[in-house]
A protein has these predicted regions:
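N-terminal Sec-pathway targeting helices
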Residues: 1-3
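Short, low-complexity N-terminal intrinsically disordered segments enriched in polar/charged residues
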Residues: 6-56, 160
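A short acidic/glycine-rich loop-to-helix N-cap element
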Residues: 25, 123-129, 159
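A solvent-exposed, acidic/Ser-Thr-rich amphipathic alpha-helical stretch
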Residues: 28-35, 50-105, 115, 127-131
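Beta-strand elements of well-folded, non-transmembrane domains
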Residues: 118-122
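Short beta-strand edge/turn micro-motifs at domain boundaries
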Residues: 132-160
Length: 160
């Protein structure tokens, strides 16, 4: 009887260890997927490629910027982005840095925040725009397997 209990106890430990290992592997895989998403997200912003930026957004995404009403839906966010960049003829993004922190993945949902730094060169030799901010993203892995932004909140930061 004790041998049977010991065997059952051993099996329970093995099953627990296996499920914890599987969960850890899934979390590691999720983190790697988020890190890959982040590289695409940064690259799209560096190139000022509105189509690539919008490809990172969910249809029902919400953008939260200071001093503005929430931008609800991909179409609204895309219009805002196009309006802003249409007023930036001749501007060149020289640098985009996003230092992502606190990456947390739970199934098909993830969140992270970042320190953000952009350097933009205006036309006509005007002084560069050197800005800092903080960013919070909530991401969802959609049916097509791609992670997309469902919520983004940004605010002005200070130079570290």
């Amino acid at each position: 009887m004790l041998a049977a209990v010991a065997v059952l106890g051993g099996l329970a430990l093995l099953l627990t260890a296996k499920s914890e290992g599987t969960a850890a592997h899934a979390a590691d895989g999720g983190r790697a997927e988020i890190e890959a998403f982040n590289k695409k997200y940064i690259e799209a912003h560096l190139k000022m490629n509105n189509a690539a930026i919008m490809a990172t957004w969910a249809e029902d995404g919400v953008g939260l910027l200071p001093g503005t009403a929430p931008m609800i839906g991909k179409a609204t966010i895309g219009k805002f982005l196009n309006d802003v960049t249409s007023r930036m003829e001749g501007y060149h993004m020289q640098k985009v840095e996003m230092d992502f922190q606190g990456i947390s993945v739970s199934g098909d949902w993830a969140s992270e925040w970042a320190y953000e730094h952009q350097v933009v060169q205006p036309p006509d030799q005007k002084p560069v725009i050197d800005s800092y901010g903080k960013l919070l993203l909530v991401l969802h892995k959609e049916a097509d397997g791609n992670w997309r932004v469902t919520r983004e909140m940004w605010n002005q930061g200070m130079k570290p």
